[in-house]
């Protein structure tokens, strides 16, 4: 990320972090200072649920929420085994952060193949280098709990069907399920 920021700085981009537009400064004030273009990077505000039974169990975290808690100095109780659902850059950030927080076995569970992953190749390679294991063509169907806490994850084996509107082959369930 720092290398990407440096490239932008070299291009003349000026960063103003921690500024509340509308409170600390207004767009009109910035215009008066000669600025002509603005990019407001507010970030993702909330994790999206995956929509399977068991999401309410203790030990289930949304990716954005998990990263926010860690960035604020928190230590989420993730245990020694961690499954991260998804194949994007946030999922890569979450799995690598989980490893750094002490998870000994960290898995990416992704419903398509590696070729269809939206994450940057560099992010995937770095996650692999940090010991993250990948389980492709798997989709979560249930988060299993014991005494109100996560104990396992039930996944369904997927196959790739016809391409979707973005050109990625659509995952299709096979009814073959296993517990990981």
Mark where each language-model region is.
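Beta1/beta-strand and adjacent pyrophosphate-binding region of the FAD-binding site
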Residues: 78-88
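Flexible, Lys/Arg-rich cytosolic regulatory linkers and terminal tails that connect or flank
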Residues: 56-58
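A Rossmann-like FAD-binding core segment of flavoenzymes
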Residues: 2-49, 61-78, 100-180
């Amino acid at each position: 990320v720092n290398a990407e920021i440096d490239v932008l700085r070299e291009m003349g981009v000026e960063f103003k972090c921690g500024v509340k537009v509308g409170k600390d400064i207004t767009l009109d004030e910035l215009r008066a200072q000669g600025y002509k273009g603005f990019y407001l990077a507010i970030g993702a505000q909330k994790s999206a649920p995956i929509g399977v039974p068991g999401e309410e169990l203790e030990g289930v975290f949304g990716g954005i929420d998990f990263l926010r808690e860690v960035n604020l100095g928190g230590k989420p109780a993730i245990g020694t085994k961690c499954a991260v659902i998804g194949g994007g850059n946030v999922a890569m950030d979450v799995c690598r952060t989980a490893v750094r927080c002490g998870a000994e076995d960290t898995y990416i569970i992704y419903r398509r193949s590696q070729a269809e992953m939206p994450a940057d190749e560099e992010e995937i390679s770095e996650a692999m280098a940090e010991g993250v294991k990948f389980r492709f063509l798997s989709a979560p169907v249930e988060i299993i709990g014991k005494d109100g806490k996560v104990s396992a994850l039930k996944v369904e084996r997927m196959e790739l069907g016809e391409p979707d509107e973005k050109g990625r082959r659509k995952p299709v369930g096979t009814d073959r399920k296993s517990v990981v």
